[in-house]
Amino acid sequence: MAQNKNLNLELSLSQYVEDDPWVLKKKLSDSDLYYSAQLYLPKQEMEHFVLPEMDHDLVRKLGAGVEVKVRDVDSVDDFYTVRLKVRNGQYYLGKGWGLIKNAKVLNTGDHIGLFWDKLTREVKFKHFKSQSITMHREAGTTSTQKNVLQKK
């Protein structure tokens, strides 16, 4: 019988480190909710944590915009089809974002979290309401993100 030395079969529900999958965190501003039908996403976090997890073909089409499914983790049956696009180096959710902000009754100052689930090929969404989410001052990164960024 062969010996098993240091075999680690630990499974994770997320491809992200630690227990904080919310790699895109944002405190909503008036411009996210009232002045445009777009939610601009943090560029550094998109490029370090989201794009590497997406299919290459999907990333290649971001300039023209791609439809992605956004699923609310607090209500698994709630999902929305939203256009994810990049323009002038800025990533944003466009068409469909208005449905989410209205359905979830999002307000200025509310915090939201997002991440790309590569298994289901969809964006996971969480509304933290007006709760503060732990963020570092440098580039608005979470502790999980900061550790990964420092390793690069």
From Swiss-Prot:
GO terms for molecular function: DNA binding. CDD domains: B3_DNA. InterPro entries: B3_DNA-bd, B3_domain, DNA-bd_pseudobarrel_sf. Keywords: DNA-binding, Nucleus, Transcription, Transcription regulation. Residues 24-131 bind DNA. GO terms for cellular component: nucleus. SUPFAM superfamilies: DNA-binding pseudobarrel domain. Transmembrane segments: none annotated. Coiled coil: none annotated. The keyword Protease does not apply. PANTHER family: B3 DOMAIN PROTEIN, TRANSCRIPTION FACTOR B3-DOMAIN FAMILY-RELATED. It comes from the Eukaryota. This is B3 domain-containing protein At1g10455. It is found in: Nucleus.
